[in-house]
A protein has these predicted regions:
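Cysteine-centered catalytic environments shared across enzyme families
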Residues: 1-183, 190, 217, 465
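Short helix/loop capping segments that flank catalytic or ligand/cofactor-binding pockets
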Residues: 6-9, 27-29, 81-82, 228-230, ...
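Short alpha-helical segments and helix-capping/turn motifs at coil-helix boundaries
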Residues: 55-57, 202-212, 448
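Adenosyl-5′-phosphate
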Residues: 62, 216, 256-473
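Generic recognition of stable, solvent-exposed alpha-helical segments in well-folded globular domains
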Residues: 66, 99, 103, 107, ...
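Residue-level preference for long, well-ordered alpha-helices that form the structural scaffold
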Residues: 97-104, 195-198, 298
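A short acidic-Thr-Gly-centered motif at the start of a beta-strand
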Residues: 116-117, 209-212, 320
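ATP-dependent adenylate-handling ligase core
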Residues: 154-210, 223-248, 253-257, 293, ...
């Protein structure tokens, strides 16, 4: 399991190895004599980045087998060894862009075909985004019957576009309207255990529609289709950075708010105990050095994929898969390798994703695409693409000339929080179990969390950690 799609947690005690695919089960069934302690560094990393490092858990004594590795336990010596059997390739293809695009599409189609073998009832999560449009394009082009699923407020861009697609391509759409978001609080403990306490609670949103999906044979999920085919935050400077400088440059970039970090450097230094002032940057460099055989642009992609992807997105899929088979075409090994080999310059600004849709799935390209609060158009209708490009500039938050389009996760979610969750969040903050430890500056913590409209991840991570501590210590 080279991407850790199935987690394995373990510890050694009195010359025996104990392991489980469930973190909480492993804790619940441990011997009373086996003492566990809170992993303070993991707590800080989670608060800072909304994710974990590839082996971290919230318990010092319990580890997780990292991606692309196998674990062996020697019964005679009672020692473990972890060996790597897969790693990222440092090669970038020299093929023409046209040939690369053709190969990516061939591998994409093969990947979906494997997910659908023997499956009669097929579902996909439909939104206005690129991931679901790519899946939709394949199903429509092959005339495969399926059911679409969408959830959220009725006036969100994603919901509006999902309904447009359903009408245009004549598929059944199951829509779950969010009149409120109380399900976050009501199902908190259930969802925390399902995700091994490794997901900020605001990322629990896919679980609210599982009951509607439970009769499907498979749900095609778009996670990871975008990771390397859009070259997330691609920067030209990475093309020419020498390897001996790449670790330091990329570590500094990841330390900035927005790249990889929820907290900016100033906020982090205020919140974290002084003894941890250099912990995050030093940890980044240590982890990046493990991958420094890669050229700079691939080093950036690999690190982002591993920690934001395998440790942030995968818990959603792991939890959902306990109810229904959630298939990830984006993690098919042949598809992954095909996209990985493409130079970053071909993937920037969603170029490859747009060309994939325009060249092979034109039928679904005439409906607008949604990126947060921005709209893309890649269809053939004259003038519409130019119109949306102009609107994108006029509505950009940086300029504020026109009001931006409906941005649920960036704006409207806070109205729901204030209506449905604010008293609960305030109470959780006041009684946060991390305040009983010294790795945080308590006054600064309370001051930071008293602010209005913090990044969602700040609420999500702190509440999950606190409730984990209360349950297990």
């Amino acid at each position: 399991d080279r991407f850790s799609t199935i987690p394995f947690y373990y510890y050694i005690y009195k010359n025996k190895i104990y392991g489980s695919v469930s973190f909480q089960d492993l804790i619940n069934k441990k011997s009373k004599d086996f003492k566990i302690t809170l992993n303070e560094e993991a707590c800080l990393f989670f608060l800072k980045t909304n994710t974990f490092l590839n082996t971290q858990t919230l318990i010092n004594e319990i580890s997780r087998v990292p991606y692309g590795c196998s674990l062996e336990f020697n019964k005679k010596t009672c020692k473990i060894s972890i060996s790597r059997y897969w790693n990222f390739t440092n090669k970038t293809s020299k093929e023409s862009y046209e040939n690369l695009l053709l190969d990516v599409n061939d591998k994409f189609q093969s990947s979906i075909n494997k997910c659908l073998i023997g499956k009669q009832k097929i579902g996909i999560n439909i939104s206005g985004g690129y991931d679901s449009r790519q899946l939709l394009g394949y199903l429509v082009s092959k005339k495969i019957k399926f059911t679409g699923y969408n959830y959220g407020p009725t006036d969100s861009l994603d919901s509006i576009v999902a309904k447009e697609l359903s009408k245009k391509h004549d598929f059944n759409l199951v829509f779950k309207n969010w009149e409120n978001i109380k399900f976050y609080k009501e199902n908190l403990f259930k969802y925390m255990e399902l995700t091994d306490y490794m997901l900020a609670f605001h990322h629990f949103h896919p679980f609210n529609i599982l009951s509607e999906q439970k009769n499907e044979d498979v749900i095609l999920y778009g996670h990871f289709l975008d990771f390397h085919s859009q070259a997330w935050k691609y920067q030209k400077k990475y093309e020419n950075v020498p390897n001996n400088h790449s670790v330091s440059i990329i570590a500094n970039d990841f330390n900035l708010a927005g790249h990889f970090s929820v907290l900016n450097d100033k906020e982090q230094k205020k919140l974290f105990n002084f003894k941890y002032k250099d912990y995050f940057l030093e940890t980044l460099k240590k982890e990046l050095n493990k991958l420094n055989f890669l050229p700079a642009e691939k080093l950036y992609d690999a690190f982002y994929f591993l920690h934001h992807g395998t440790r942030r997105l995968l818990p959603q899929v792991q939890a959902a898969s306990k109810t229904i088979y959630y298939a990830l075409p984006g993690l098919n090994t042949l598809y992954f390798d095909s996209v990985w080999n493409v130079p970053g310059k071909f993937k920037k600004k969603n170029k490859m994703r747009q060309d994939l849709l325009k060249n092979y799935y034109q039928e679904v390209s005439d409906t607008k695409l949604v990126r947060d609060d921005q709209i893309d158009y890649i269809g053939k209708k004259f003038g519409i693409n130019t119109f949306y490009k102009i609107m994108k500039i006029l509505k950009h938050k940086k300029f504020g000339i026109l009001k931006s389009d409906y941005d649920f996760w960036g704006q409207q979610i806070y109205e729901y929080i204030e209506k449905d969750l604010e008293p609960w969040i305030k109470n959780e903050t006041k009684h946060n179990a991390m305040l009983d430890y010294d790795f945080l500056n308590k006054d600064e913590f309370l001051k930071y969390y008293s602010k209005k409209r913090l990044p969602l991840s700040s609420y999500g991570t702190s509440i999950v950690i606190s409730n984990f501590i209360k349950k297990n210590f």
